[in-house]
Amino acid sequence: MRCDLPFCTVLVVTHLWFACDFGVAQPAAPEVRLLFSTSQDVQNPWGRLHFGATPMQKIRDCDPPGFTLACCLPRADGSWDVYGQAFSRDAAPEADTRAKNTWKLVHATTRDGTTFDNLETVYAGATGPWTDHLGLAYNPDTREFLALKLLMDDNGFGYRAFFSANGRDWTAYADKPLFYDGDSLGLFWSPVSKRFVCTNKTLQPYLKHIQDHGGTHPQNNNDQLRDRRVLAIRSSVDGRQWEPAESLMDVWNRLGSYRALPAELMLTPDADDPPDLEHYRGVGFWYHDRSYMVVLNYAASALTPRKHAPQLDTEWWVSRNGLKWERPYRDINAVGDSFPGVVCITHNPLLIDGMILFHTGNQLLGIPQDRISFVGSRANAEFSTAPFAMPKADLQLNAAVPAPERPFAKQQAYVMVGILDDQGTVVPGFEPDKCVLQIVDQIDLPLRWGDRSARELSGRTIRLRFYLRSANIYAVTSGTRGVHAG
């Protein structure tokens, strides 16, 4: 998907990398990590830039671990704490709100994303009409875990909260739902908003051109208005009080009190979408200084009238705070060729050996580190980064020259990099013609100007000026350490 670039201005983007033991943040030395997702990430452009996203690829098959991953936190020794859910469904047909489903929270550790050691049960939920959905996230400020589970009753899907101070000892919060809404959710902590963010399905009355199994309700005063799936973004400082607090009530109208959320609280398809598109599920996560979300899209089908149709595709969304979302990559199927066997993610990524990894039961999917999104060009183009304080370190570039979608441009593709001072003047010795990259595809290309390194400029405020053709630029980093993803 390509997004034409308007002029934009961005302020300083620097980062403190965090190593976590059970998610407890330990500050390290300042590190540069510049990502490129939208026009907000570039300054003073020339030419035609576009922004894109990378679909996941299958890394390898793996044995199902007996649980579904929900939250992954890096440990100081390079391994990862993994929290997830083991779920067992009541075999009785049409059990519905009388179902006797069982679930438990589990903890394990991993070094490779497929082998899980030290597996233990940390909480066993009461038997009941639970769904198999789980959201689990960690607030490093208060050092508290939050888990959200859905429990069915005649009103619909009640969102129930569970808390833990250490990931091992969990307590149910209150004997009532936080709110009611649709039967799908994602959950993560936004360090920018200082809030838990819940990305949940909700239902909107809508005139569907092709009707599927979506319900209708007499309260809508129009039998042609049918439920379509859209998203709602809720947030909470502490996981106990949520905004918005409104509920999707009596979703099956069993109590005669059906009520949808107000339309202004919904994230709905827009004029750039197919008219029958629906947002079936969204699972987001924090990555460095922004959040990404994998959204599962759906559309009814004329081949299956009044029945559930196949899922349509998946999509990458991006946000600077977890609350307001952009959709610049609509034509990219986020989970790649694993769809429709894999229709969404269930956890924030593991970052192992230069890869962003997602476990999907019997497959491990991945993307090279920092390559979820990129800025690129077809012909010649230029842009500057936001200004940043140069650390005492070398700079590295994550780039593909030529871009993967333009292998025929191998001989003509290039990236050139210059360094500008705080006045926008080229720093002598760091002119762009001294740093030229061709026929390279690497996440950590050393940026050198002859025999010189930007390390010489440590302590100064600088910007990089990029010149590119038929290339993708994913990130600029200092050092080789990982990035916190929550």
Language-model region placement:
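Positively charged n-region of N-terminal signal peptides that target proteins for export
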Residues: 1-6
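Carbohydrate-active catalytic/glycan-binding domains of CAZyme proteins
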Residues: 20, 25-486
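Bacterial N-terminal signal peptides
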Residues: 8-21
